[in-house]
A protein has these predicted regions:
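Conserved ATP-binding N-box helix of the HATPase_c
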Residues: 6-8, 89-124, 183-185
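A glycine-rich helix N-cap at a beta->alpha junction
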Residues: 38-56
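Helix-loop-beta hinge of the Bergerat
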Residues: 55-86, 140, 147-166
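Conserved helix-loop functional segments at active or binding sites
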Residues: 78, 82, 104, 108, ...
Length: 251
């Protein structure tokens, strides 16, 4: 939710428009202040997160590895809840690699270099939720521009094509490992969701049979691409949690 809203506000800001937020509850306002979203867009200072569950909102240059590394290290891997989710070094390296591959895709394919990130820890559920997005050329638009055979395909099908092994819009022989590699890394123990232009695509975790759900949204194209993943180390608990948990809006 936070990253999607951030995508919209960045577009409004680039257009030179004035924006304000009205009608949000006090709890939501505090949550969006703790994760640095409201201070980033409206100014002011952040609130202290006494439980340290929040992965703060980040908006930066996808090409700036040092800043992105610092953000991930401080907000994700040095968080005291990281070991509540997983103490597996391979899991940490896998997530870090996947996030950096996503950022690389932003700079290579979307024609913009700005990447937005935010997340939330749910330590009692052994769960991490993280979202990343850009406001550049969408995945479907990028594919139809470079692969003209797909001009009339639904956007969700185009996203699915982009996640398959060996598919790419780049000419290099070594390309085509981007979203497939990311999907393989992130769905071993969690779900992966991609929304781009009119397409919605989600792959459940391999533990939950790895089923793919995809459909097209009606008359609500999203400029750019939004990607969310969850790392669920205790699926028996998380599967019994109501999906309408209000905390889930905060990332």
């Amino acid at each position: 939710m936070t990253v999607l809203l951030g995508m919209l506000l960045r577009e409004v800001k680039k257009a030179g428009k004035i924006y304000m937020l009205n009608g949000i509850t006090d709890d939501v306002s505090k949550a969006l202040t703790r994760n640095n979203f409201l201070p980033y867009f409206l100014g002011g200072t952040t609130l202290t997160d006494n439980y340290n569950n929040t992965i703060q909102f980040y908006c930066g240059d996808a090409r700036d590895d040092s800043s992105l590394n610092k953000y991930l290290d401080e907000q994700v891997f040095r968080n005291n809840h990281w070991n509540d989710v997983t103490s597996n070094q391979q899991e940490q390296e896998k997530i870090s690699s996947a996030i950096h591959e996503l950022a690389l895709n932003v700079s290579e394919h979307s024609t913009v270099n700005e990447v937005l990130c935010c997340g939330q820890y749910y330590p009692t559920l052994h769960k991490l939720s993280f979202a990343l997005a850009d406001n550049g050329i969408s995945i479907p638009a990028n594919i139809t521009t470079n692969k003209h055979l797909f001009d009339v395909s639904p956007d969700s099908n185009l996203i699915n094509w982009a996640t398959l092994r060996g598919t790419s819009t780049k000419a290099e022989p070594a390309s085509g490992l981007g979203l497939y590699s990311i999907k393989s890394k992130l769905t071993s123990s969690g779900g992966l969701t991609i929304i781009s232009r009119n397409g919605y695509w989600r792959k459940a975790s391999n533990i939950e049979n790895g089923a793919v759900t995809m459909f097209d949204l009606d008359n609500s194209p999203l400029k750019g691409t939004f990607i969310h993943f969850s790392l669920d180390m205790n699926t028996q608990v998380t599967n019994n949690v109501n999906n309408t948990n209000p905390q889930s809006i905060f990332f």
